[in-house]
A protein has these predicted regions:
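Non-heme di-metal
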Residues: 104-107
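Positively charged n-region of N-terminal signal peptides that target proteins for export
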Residues: 1-4
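Bacterial N-terminal signal peptides
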Residues: 7-15
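Short S/T/G/P-rich N-terminal loop/turn motif that feeds into the first structured element of a domain
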Residues: 14, 18-101, 112-131
């Protein structure tokens, strides 16, 4: 239940750049670092992920690393969060990422850094823009 609440609050608080009329899909992975791995390792992975993503046919997504600050620390070490403009774009990006040889190798490296025990998809609707 705590994992559910934290994931829900996290997804609802994502800072989208523009107010959306329709909810957008947000994928939330709940992860623990594998032995000897740290935030720095995950940040290094994201450097390579971003380079590879820039070359994808559909790089239309945003990604965040959420580290607990004032939260249920038993839930996980880190939340890995990705948002997409719509479900079609999400499907295209996921098929491309999980279906390619180079991207598959990158995901295999990701799995050496974190052990993700939860993966949820939320539909998030921004209700207030800070501008």
């Amino acid at each position: 239940m705590n994992r559910f609440l934290l994931a829900a609050m996290t997804a609802l608080m994502l800072p989208f750049t523009a107010a959306a009329d329709e909810p957008v899909p947000v994928e939330v992975w709940v992860c623990d670092y594998k032995e000897g791995q740290t935030l720095s390792d995950l940040e290094d992975w994201y450097d390579d992920f971003n380079k590879l993503s820039d070359g994808m046919d559909n790089p239309n997504f945003e990604a965040w690393i959420w580290t607990p600050f004032f939260a249920d620390l038993t839930m996980g070490d880190v939340l890995v969060v990705t948002s997409f403009p719509d479900l079609e774009s999400m499907g295209q990006s996921m098929m491309e990422f999980f279906g390619g040889d180079e991207t598959g190798a990158l995901f295999a490296r990701y799995q050496t850094i974190v052990d993700c025990t939860g993966r949820d998809l939320w539909m998030v609707q921004q209700m207030r823009d800070r501008d």
